[in-house]
Amino acid sequence: MSETAKKVIVGMSGGVDSSVSAWLLQQQGYQVEGLFMKNWEEDDGEEYCTAAADLADAQAVCDKLGIELHTVNFAAEYWDNVFELFLAEYKAGRTPNPDILCNKEIKFKAFLEFAAEDLGADYIATGHYVRRADVDGKSRLLRGLDSNKDQSYFLYTLSHEQIAQSLFPVGELEKPQVRKIAEDLGLVTAKKKDSTGICFIGERKFREFLGRYLPGQPGKIITVDGDEIGEHQGLMYHTLGQRKGLGIGGTKEGTEEPWYVVDKDVENNILVVAQGHEHPRLMSVGLIAQQLHWVDREPFTGTMRCTVKTRYRQTDIPCTVKALDDDRIEVIFDEPVAAVTPGQSAVFYNGEVCLGGGIIEQRLPLPV
């Protein structure tokens, strides 16, 4: 290894993607070390929390690859900058995306600073399925090569400066290739299933978890025609377009379409439902977004044509974006879209390039 080899700290989660990322960087000649972040303090004896197992897996991978593993506890930062905001959004009747907040506040802020200042890193690396490309002296965020696994939606808040300090080795690969590399290397994470759900809730019941921190306020479930047909246990447990867990059965005779949440009246604590997943009340012609983050950090003025995702794994929607002021934009879709949800993120693309995004403040309903 040459004296000038750049030092990279890989965020080791105990999963297959970060494991293979570390090996790929070794192959590319970097001086590689790992960092395991503990972001959540679980109660003793809670089986669902896999932090200890994840740390053991991360350590086993680092031992196998011959690299040092550092650990750091960001639980206080996580609580203050991610979790408190997550609860506040739910309390206001919106549906936040904590993974996006975690990337913004922890992985590409607290971790990036810790790696550079405390560990002397030139770069950090993560197992995200995204790519970076440097154009005109600025780093751009691109979709991952594996369109099925692309995670650019979760990283839209990053600036070109943060991307310039970050490496995404698996973004250039397809997921099956990543698993194959891990198997060939005999890594313990090769067959480990991908983590799902919100990191601090893990596999456990979301409703039960949320209820610990926010007491539910029961209220009426009303149809779009104004008929009361049931009771909800708290608006925060429901999101637009939701069908399961309403407790009102599919339909009266079982012949009609099932009920879907089409609106939340936060002021009166009423959940509004309608039948059919393409009910006009569920459709939006556009949205207003705020808290904007553009990757190039240039203020957006005027209008542009691009595509948008209003949730992860959604097909790109062609749209026109218009600046309303410094921090708000209006987005008009070419075709109406179902279940556009305030609190979630709208993320914009120009082909492979992720331009940035913002938080959906309100949806623009289909004119009745």
Swiss-Prot record:
Q: Name one GO molecular function term.
A: ATP binding
Q: What are the protein's UniProt keywords?
A: ATP-binding, Cytoplasm, Disulfide bond, Nucleotide-binding, RNA-binding, Transferase, tRNA processing, tRNA-binding
Region Interaction with tRNA: what ranges? 149-151, 311-312
On whether Oxidoreductase is a keyword of this UniProt record, the answer is no
Enzyme class name: transferase
User: Record keywords: Cytoplasm included?
Assistant: yes
Kindly state one GO CC term assigned in the UniProt record: cytoplasm
Please report which protein family the annotation says this sequence is part of: Belongs to the MnmA/TRMU family.
Annotated protein name in UniProt: tRNA-specific 2-thiouridylase MnmA
Which species is this UniProt entry from?
Shigella sonnei (strain Ss046)
